Amino acid sequence: MENLTISHITTNAQNLEMWVAIDQSNSLAVGHIFMNVEKDNKIKFLDAWVHSDYRRQGIYRLLWETRWEYVLENYKGYTIYAWCKETSLPLLIEKGFETGEIVTYVEKKI
């Protein structure tokens, strides 16, 4: 997207870092992606979201690649891990991640 900018934001309290995609033509936040820097040199890749009107335009990939390049430049020697949906798995495998156990979400209202 021509009018898209990505801003990097860090938090002090929770060790979270995020990137936000902004459509400059209307100042709308159209996507975000997070990571959590943990103890013992680990980083957990967290959720990502893209506004429904902006999906299928490469914004998720752009956010993911921006975060990935940042990690490669700033966290050499860290172990990166993620819990991901089936739709995100091909990108993680493309980047050299190895799959672990399959986990199934369950819930019950009581």
Predicted regions and their residues:
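Acidic/histidine-enriched, beta-strand-rich ligand/metal-binding domains
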Residues: 46, 55, 91-94
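Conserved acetyl-CoA-binding loop-helix of GNAT-fold acetyltransferases
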Residues: 56-69
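Extracellular/lumenal ectodomain signal focusing on beta-strand-rich modules
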Residues: 47, 102-105
